[in-house]
Structure formats: C-alpha cells, structure tokens
Amino acid sequence: MSCLPALDKFLQNYHQAYLTTLGELPRYYPQGEPSVCIQGEFFADSDKPIAWQPVKRDEVGSFTNVEHALDLPLWPDIHLFYGQYFSAPLLFDSKWGTGELLQVWNDDDFKCLQQNVIGHLMMKKKLKQPPTWFIGLLDEGDKMLTINNSDGSVWIEIPGEEQSEQLSTSLTAFIEALSPRIAPPVKHEELPMPALDHPGIFANIKRMWQNLFGKS
C-alpha cells in the first residue's frame, strides 16, 4: 500500500492543528535557504523563523539514480515519502515518544538527502548489515527511524547498529499512528561540513551523520 495517502492526511492535519491552536501556520528557521514553502517575505540574511506550508512538487523526486549507483532496488515508499512534497521537518507525538519526520526543503536539500542515503547504505554494507533508509528521529537519545528495505517495515535504529525494535509493519501504518506536535521553531546548529548546510535534512540528523561518518 502506498504511503502517500497517509502522508497527505498527516500534512493536512499538521497545518490544521497549528491554525486551530495558534491561529497561524507553523514556523521554521530556513537558515538562509530559499523554498517554495515559505509564506511571506524571505531574506537570506535573516535569522528569524518564517511561516511555511508544504508544496506538492511539479516533478516528483526519484531515487532511481541512487538505486543505479548502488545496484540496489529501494523499497518504493522512499520515492513517495521524499519525492512528493517540499516541506519542513514534521514534528510528532506518538506512543513511542516525540520525534520528527524528515522532509525536503528545496532541490538542493533533495540532492543532499540522496547523498546521505547513499552514505548510510554504504555504511550498512561496510558493517555487513541489512540495508535500511531513514525517515526521521525520535527525540530520546540517538534513535533513528528507519525502513527495512526488504519489507518496508518501520524500526528504531541506533547509528552503527542493526535495527533493534519494530514499530510498524509499514510506513503507512506508522504515519497513521502519529499526531502533529505543536511546538515553537528550534534553530539547529550549523555543522562544520559544507555538505551539511541545508537545514531541511542535515541539520536534523546531526547525531546520525556524526556517528555514521565519524567512524569511517
């Protein structure tokens, strides 16, 4: 089953929750990165958060190039989860704790995401572990949310280790179990690597990157 209907509904509920509770759109620190998601004026040198809303992409993003580069078919949900929208990360509450779903802020962010997916999969191969790809983070500790590439199930994964706890049999069921979390925007730290300057993806997986690529 495609994860897109569940993602569509969560995005709708997400923005409605902010409008109902706060009377405004969610806010986000773009850190100088433009995006079609931005509502209102945008100044690249501003350090203030902006209002945003998701925008469906004119051309759906694809990971076919990643599949070819690694000679590895990816579970189809990756194209839908990351390729349909431009969006800021999505905060959530769940029975597993609070966390966030990663999304893509702009075209450059998508390219950086692809690079990081490749790096993650190469590290899994190096460690002789089954392939996975990430969809987000839990706020507690260094817990990534990853997809088992063989069957599409959702798991908790600690960087450098195999998946440890299955949360859902599918990405659809996992998203359907989440509730939007209303919270003020948080300004993420800039990382000291040029490839990580894009806030939509890399500033939100700081711990994962440091664990994966600090142990090469």
Swiss-Prot record:
Pfam families noted in UniProt: Syd
Annotated keywords: Cell inner membrane, Cell membrane, Membrane
Topology of the protein relative to the lipid bilayer: Peripheral membrane protein
Functional note: Interacts with the SecY protein in vivo. May bind preferentially to an uncomplexed state of SecY, thus functioning either as a chelating agent for excess SecY in the cell or as a regulatory factor that negatively controls the translocase function.
Source organism per UniProt: Shewanella putrefaciens (strain CN-32 / ATCC BAA-453)
Protein name: Protein Syd
Domain of life: Bacteria
Subcellular location(s) per record: Cell inner membrane
The gene coding this protein: syd
GO cellular component terms, semicolon-separated: cytoplasmic side of plasma membrane
Gene3D superfamilies in the cross-refs: Syd protein (3.40.1580.20)
Membrane-crossing residue ranges in chain numbering: none
The family this protein is said to belong to: Belongs to the Syd family.
